[in-house]
Each structure stands twice: as structure tokens, then as C-alpha cells.
Design a protein with these regions (language model features):
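Terminal transmembrane helical anchor/hairpin motif
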Residues: 39-40, 163, 168-244
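Hydrophobic alpha-helical transmembrane segments
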Residues: 1-50, 56, 210-248
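Helix-capping/transition residues at the boundaries of transmembrane alpha-helices
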Residues: 12, 77-79, 154
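Helix-loop-helix units of permease transmembrane domains in multi-pass membrane transporters
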Residues: 64-97
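Membrane-interfacial segments
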Residues: 69, 73, 109, 113-122, ...
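Transmembrane alpha-helical core residues of multi-pass small-molecule transporters
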Residues: 25-29, 94, 166-173
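Secretory targeting signals
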Residues: 27-52, 56-57, 93-159, 213-220
């Protein structure tokens, strides 16, 4: 039953800018850095998780939410004999899937670009295949909690303010706290902090000089588990609030 809701939600975005954005954002990121071959992989990842991906994720969630929250303000959905709780969770599921697909495309472009540079310029890969895959997985999981948050923000304050708050202020806050002792209590810093250990990239784009201070595997796993728990909490909370508002 839940899969039917997800399929229905996905169909709403057929031939829309939301689907285009899934491909456009990774391609723009790769293209912006391809002409600096020596640092292509490092710069691409840094630009992706610091700037392009937060914008992509936020805008994707906002566009998904606004698809039903236009002139009708969910009245069309509320009139249907469906579970409003599941309708909202389907939006979360579709946004999460789009995030995964966008990150997978970025991973493929980063590695293809790295191999192309190896062949053309004889510059070896600075980030290996498994390291890149691990880094991409960390980006997806550690940012997953933003999906229900962005959907709810979009419902309450609209696209523009949501982008400013999440992709703007949130990202800036994450950058400034990622290298401090406050990183664990600031969810926005989880991705940039993980990238220090997993990919060896500082938030300012410079490579990590001393890898001896890198987090252990279990510490990285703990952060990812906390992110998943936070995602589950926000998903259930926003779904309940949505159901109460639309049904009540």
C-alpha cells in the first residue's frame, strides 16, 4: 500500500523541473570543476556537499511539497479517500529517493571525470572508488533528516524562505561548526565533519594534512545512526501534524 502512495507521488513530478534538477545539479557541479583537473575530485565533492547539494535537496523537497500546496492548498488531496499520513510520508519517500539518485549521478560523474583526467592528463585519482562511494553514502544518510524538515518548512513558509533557512543559514552554520567541538550537536555540521574523515576534505576545500585525528569507523556509524533516528522522528512528527491539519 505504501508503495502505491510513493508511485502516485512520483507520477506527479513526471516531466517537471523537479526531475530535471536531479540530473542538472550533479552535472553543473562536475562541469564547474572539470577544467581544474588537478583538484577535480576534491573540489567537486567540496562544492557538492557544501553548496550545490544543500540547494538541490532543499529545492527538490520544496517543489515536491508545493506540487499539492498550490492554489488548492491540499484541498484536492484532502478530498480523496486516502490516508493523509501516508500521503505525507510518500512525499518524504520520493524526496529521499530523488536525493539518492542525484547523489548516485554525482558519484558516477566524479569517478568518470577522475578517470578521464587520468587518461588525458595522467593525473591519478585523488579519491578512490570505494572511498567516493563511502563518502556519497555518508552525504545521503547524514542529510536525510533534512527531507521532512524542508517539506514542512515549505508547507509553512514557502519555497523562498525554506531555501534561505535550510540551504543558506543551515549550510553556513554547518560549515562554521564542523571543525569545532559543537559539531555533534549541530545536525547541519554532520556532513562536512564526516567528509573530513571519510574523504579527507576540510569544509574550506583544502585536503586534510593530518589524518591521524580522523574519526573511527564506529564513530562515523554512530553519527549515521543518529541521523537516521532524527529522520524517523521528524518524519513521524511532520506526518502526524500534516494529518491533523488536513483531516481536522
Amino acid at each position: 500500500m505504501e508503495m502505491a502512495y510513493i508511485q502516485a507521488e512520483n507520477l506527479k513530478h513526471k516531466r517537471t523541473f523537479t526531475k530535471t534538477l536531479i540530473v542538472l545539479a550533479p552535472f553543473v557541479t562536475a562541469l564547474m570543476n572539470f577544467f581544474a583537473p588537478l583538484w577535480f575530485q576534491f573540489n567537486s565533492y567540496n562544492w557538492w556537499y557544501i553548496l550545490l547539494y544543500p540547494g538541490f535537496l532543499t529545492l527538490t523537497c520544496a517543489l515536491i511539497e508545493q506540487r499539492d500546496n498550490g492554489k488548492l492548498k491540499y484541498r484536492a488531496v484532502a478530498s480523496l479517500p486516502v490516508s493523509q499520513n501516508k500521503v505525507w510520508k510518500a512525499k518524504i519517500g520520493v524526496a529521499g529517493i530523488y536525493s539518492c539518485v542525484g547523489n548516485f549521478i554525482f558519484l558516477a560523474l566524479n569517478l568518470l571525470g577522475g578517470f578521464a583526467i587520468l587518461v588525458i592528463n595522467e593525473i591519478p585519482l585523488t579519491i578512490g572508488i570505494w572511498q567516493a562511494a563511502a563518502g556519497t553514502a555518508c552525504i545521503v544518510i547524514a542529510s536525510l533528516w533534512e527531507v521532512p524538515l524542508c517539506l514542512w518548512l515549505s508547507k509553512k513558509v514557502g519555497i523562498f524562505v525554506t531555501v534561505i533557512l535550510n540551504a543558506g543559514l543551515g549550510s553556513v552554520l554547518g560549515i562554521f561548526t564542523a571543525t569545532t567541538s559543537l559539531w555533534m550537536i549541530c545536525p547541519y555540521s554532520w556532513v562536512p565533519h564526516l567528509m573530513i574523515s571519510v574523504l579527507g576534505i576540510l569544509p574550506n576545500g583544502e585536503p586534510v594534512a593530518d589524518r591521524s585525528a580522523a574519526m573511527s569507523f564506529w564513530m562515523i556509524l554512530l553519527v549515521l545512526v543518529i541521523s537516521l533516528v532524527w529522520f524517523a522522528v521528524l518524519s513521524c512528527l511532520t506526518a502526524k501534524l500534516f494529518e491533523k491539519k488536513e483531516v481536522g
